[in-house]
Amino acid sequence: MEYSTLIARLKTASESFENLEVQLADPDIANDPKKLESIARERSKLEPLVLDFNKLLDTDKEIEDSKNLLKENRNDKEMESLINEELITLEESKSELIQKTTIALLPKDPRDERSVMLEIRAGAGGNEACIWAGDLARMYERYGQKIGWSVKPVSASESDMGGFKELVISVKGDSVYSQLKFEAGVHRVQRVPATESQGRVHTSTATVAVMPEADPVEVKIDPTDLEVGTARSGGAGGQNVNKVETAIDLLHKPTGIRVFCTQERSQLQNRERAMEILRAKLYEIQLKEANAKERSQRLSQVGTGDRSEKIRTYNFKDNRTTDHRLGSNFSLEPILAGQLDEVINACIAQEQKRMMEDFNKGVN
């Protein structure tokens, strides 16, 4: 789109912002807490864009003034040089603001603000794959804690040799899905397992699924489609063994999805958790079906969420993490310590760049 089209869209956003401010001053809306909160949230989202739009307009005015000043000082070489330097700086600022506002206008994934259920499954590699699944779980736990998210395991199938055959983690906070969605796919590890006596490097995998939490309104579950069983939650023995059947074994008969939840202290809490996981899994199926046609047109987009997609290799011998979507390497130790900001931000930037190529061809 042309620069004039960008300005027109920004004007529309600015008008919407002004309208929201008028609504916030309305006494009737002030007496409706839910509506007030909704309008305030929308205003808050638009405010950074409107501020950048105003900066862009100011920059355009400064560029125009500088060009007029340049015409008036053509015989003054020193002044001409100073004005040209100022124009270069202003044009750079304008270019940055164009990019920033264009990104802000890109279509948003409505699920980006949601919390998620993070499912990690051991893949190829036997016991080592289970241990690797546990390592990934700790990596995400550290990342979430660093940001300030609530990270809590809600369902786990432990391996006899350590780690997990399968683990579901609830990650709650602001805009969790917008960042963790890039983690969906196959994570491959190359290292010498602790049980390997010959020092040979083994390759193992674990699959990560990132499922945005679904509202009960979005996913209708017929109670007659559920088969619910109970069991005693496991413990370390003695007083820690749960003598009451608090664990929930939930089967959704139409899909065959089974959820076993043991982490909470009561049967009711485990049932609620199991239903949360089931809703997230069913919601993921709905999204995949709804996006089947669209997906063929978005093969190049980062973070498709395809479980068969190998997204990253972690090489312990070389202390290297390779993200195959980015074609970039990162130091292994910080990544496993939960310092995922660099790689996730790079994925976000890549996605935005590709979306801009489609959405914003010809901005000048």
Swiss-Prot record:
Q: How is it modified after translation?
A: Methylated by PrmC. Methylation increases the termination efficiency of RF1.
Q: Which SMART domains match?
A: PCRF
Q: What is its main location?
A: cytoplasm
Q: Which InterPro entries match?
A: PCRF (IPR005139), Pep_chain_release_fac_I (IPR000352), Pep_chain_release_fac_I_sf (IPR045853), Prokaryotic/Mito_RF (IPR050057), RF-1 (IPR004373)
Q: Which GO terms describe its cellular component?
A: cytoplasm
Could you confirm whether the keyword Transport appears in this record? Answer: no
- Classify the source by domain of life: Bacteria
Tell me the compartments it is located in.
Cytoplasm
Q: Which residues form a coiled coil?
A: none
Which UniProt keywords are present, listed alphabetically? Answer: Cytoplasm, Methylation, Protein biosynthesis
Give residues where N5-methylglutamine occurs. 239
- GO molecular function terms attached to this record: translation release factor activity, codon specific
Presence of the UniProt keyword Glycoprotein in the record: no
The family assignment reads: Belongs to the prokaryotic/mitochondrial release factor family.
User: What does the UniProt function comment say about this protein?
Assistant: Peptide chain release factor 1 directs the termination of translation in response to the peptide chain termination codons UAG and UAA.
What is this protein called in UniProt? Peptide chain release factor 1
Q: Species name for this entry?
A: Prochlorococcus marinus (strain MIT 9301)
Query: According to the entry, what is the taxonomic lineage of the organism?
Result: Bacteria, Bacillati, Cyanobacteriota, Cyanophyceae, Synechococcales
